[in-house]
Amino acid sequence: MTEEEKINGESNYSASNIQVLEGLEAVRKRPAMYIGDISSKGLHHLVYEVVDNSIDEALAGYCDHIEVTINEDNSITVQDNGRGIPVDFHEKEQKSALEVVMTVLHAGGKFDKGSYKVSGGLHGVGVSCVNALSTHMTTQVFRNGKIYQQEYECGHPLYSVKEVGTTAITGTRQQFWPDATIFTETVYSYDILATRMRELAYLNAGIKITLTDLRVKEEDGSCKQEVFYSVEGLKEFVRYIDSSREHLVNDVIYINTEKQGTPVEVAIMYNTSYNENIHSYVNNINTIEGGAHLAGFRRALTRTLKKYAEDNKMLEKAKVEISGDDFREGLTAVISIKVAEPQFEGQTKTKLGNNEVMGAVDQAVGEALSYYLEEHPKEAKMIVDKVILAAQARVAARKARESVQRKSPMSGGGMPGKLADCSSKDPEECELFLVEGDSAGGSAKQGRNRTFQAILPLRGKILNVEKAMWHKAFESDEVNNIIQALGIRFGVDGEDSKEANIDKLRYKKVIIMTDADVDGSHIDTLIMTLFFRYFPQVIQQGYLYIATPPLYLCTKGKVKEYCWTDQQRQKFIDTYGGGSENAVHTQRYKGLGEMNPEQLWETTMNPENRMLKQVHLENAAEADYTFSMLMGEDVGPRRDFIEKNATYANIDA
């Protein structure tokens, strides 16, 4: 952007660019409609909405630094160095443009095509929605050499926009206090915010995002802080995701172009693993269900690699038919496109429906990949050899899988012999417990409610699928038992033989129930890795849970209490034992098998009393990195992670 364009942009961005669509009243009544939910996810979404405004300024070329601060009182401050929200008079609304942006839903420059070419925000509800769901919010605008301010309570302004000082900077500063009467969770997680800020920095090269947590003091007295900044954008992003994997080819194949009016940025890397990891974004939103841009990418990749291999007579020795997903084994890619008016659809509104984008991505990837392969014959041969290996493994996998899928999952035929099924056939109410060990499985079978609770005992640690070739999973009895019991099928949706289909899922609650020790946690992680790599839809749709059996049974006379944490146990000792451990009898449960069926039901299985942890997929790219780091071949990153997090671990020593 030239200096002249920048000056014109600054002078043209005014009240007339602010369009208004609808009122705010509905937001407090039905918050989940606007921000997804009212738990931790929705709470963090408030921050993303405010940051999205600053990112829009950055994409338009007016901002290069965004500061996000978690304050000591758990309020959030977001400040950017953009142009500042317009404060002049809005003719239609008869008030300051700033007040319109802050108090009217869907009011903002992002709905006026002249102000922003593209704009982020999945729900795109804007900062007014954040205002409505905050007990208090303060906005300061640095513009025209002056500081303007307005404060609000639950979305209502406390006074008109006023000047409160002079300044040499430009930008906007927002501080808000989420409403505890609306949100079930009001404590911000630094890690969740850091993950999203890191992602935004990779997706928008050249923008500096500073995240500070004033609640946490470091050893030197300073506050916890990270600066996220990327020079190479997606190139660095794909290297970060793949940092715990062995690279097949050291190059990142990078594409940054515009086709058919759509900006397309793609980074591709091949590794020696057996998983396909493609992360796609539209206007900075992670489209976890894919869509037109992902279809265009896959089509181009398959066509271009296949043509190169055939032209160079590399497939003749393969003796197997090569399919689309063979080309994607061991592939890590990030696709980021910008669309002026994205149409989102699918289960979680994260699937791109704009079909015109498919051709643009197809053309961009096809041209760039073709050029790369011609210029790098050695690397191209390594990629094609890997494809042939994948095809041979796929044929072996199909044979193994067909033996699993021969019987219908709904008929009860073909169910694992160890499965103690429930009598109900309604997936909405049915629960499947994946239980560690036969002895605990026996207690669970006796203690359960047979109407809606099914039990599948697992023998020891299941296969670590992160290190195994695709078809090896289907040769594992324990993995097969889980797939059969759930009613999951593969390759029924067309071109991708590895795509899981959960339309006939037999249970809408899948609960991992293991011992409360290190081995139990390891088994939890192995099972979660299987779900994430083979049927992530179960996690995405919120069906996977982890049971939390109690650690202790504390007794004093006739008073008995189960304790899930050391803090609860200490509270019992303080209350009933006068602070003396010796005055209280404590039974430590090392394993589920130590509980009788009634105790297991009462503490861990009864929906009235139990505590379940729902497994969330907050950020697919970060989860991809974490699973490959924890469960993959490379020991170094795993050791670093353990050393960094050892203080939080529950270790039986």
Q: Where are the model-predicted features located?
A:
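A short glycine-centered beta->alpha linker in the GHKL/HATPase_c
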Residues: 84-89
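Helical (often loop-to-helix) elements that flank the catalytic cores of nucleotide-handling enzymes
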Residues: 91, 345-358, 562-568, 572-573
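C-terminal interaction appendages of subunits in large macromolecular complexes
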Residues: 392-411, 426-431, 442, 446-448, ...
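Conserved short strand/loop->alpha-helix "switch" segment adjacent to the catalytic nucleotide/phosphoryl-transfer site
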Residues: 29-48
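GHKL-family ATPase ATP-binding module
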Residues: 2-17, 24, 48, 56-58, ...
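Short adenine-binding "F-helix/F-box" segment of the Bergerat
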Residues: 90-91, 98
